[in-house]
């Protein structure tokens, strides 16, 4: 089932807009084979499919984020981590990444409580990927 997840309705359109100006890559704790299958099945327009697997650690270990930046030939301050999980954003900001929070209120079951309040330290807070593209001038 993980290999065939349906993306959020705004995702492909928003990523396609963002890709006109930025290099887009995944960074997940899932393995590369899983992420490639997910991207292919969902039509996600990644430039690169990266995984914490490549650093041989799991996020939020700083090495996962730093390895991703290094593999893309970028300094940490040139990278923006986009996530619906605040812990992921906080960890990536600790290594110098910029951050964009896109909350997904319906990600979990209705009885699962989550704090969706944006952290004031996040660089961008967007309602979805199309809103994020608009905020970044696309």
Residue ranges and their predicted role:
Residues 16, 30-32, 36-138:
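Asp-based, Mg2+/Mn2+-dependent phosphohydrolase catalytic module
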């Amino acid at each position: 089932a993980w290999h065939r997840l349906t993306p959020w309705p705004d995702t492909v359109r928003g990523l396609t807009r963002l890709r006109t100006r930025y290099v887009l890559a995944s960074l997940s704790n899932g393995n590369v084979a899983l992420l490639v299958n997910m991207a292919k099945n969902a039509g996600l327009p990644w430039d690169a499919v990266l995984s914490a697997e490549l650093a041989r650690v799991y996020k939020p270990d700083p090495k996962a984020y730093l390895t991703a930046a290094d593999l893309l030939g970028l300094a940490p301050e040139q990278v923006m981590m986009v996530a619906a999980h605040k812990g992921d954003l906080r960890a990536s900001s600790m290594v110098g990444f910029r951050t964009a929070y896109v909350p997904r209120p319906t990600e979990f079951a209705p009885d699962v409580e989550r704090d969706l309040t944006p952290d004031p330290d996040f660089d961008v807070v967007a309602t979805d990927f199309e809103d994020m593209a608009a905020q970044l001038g696309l």
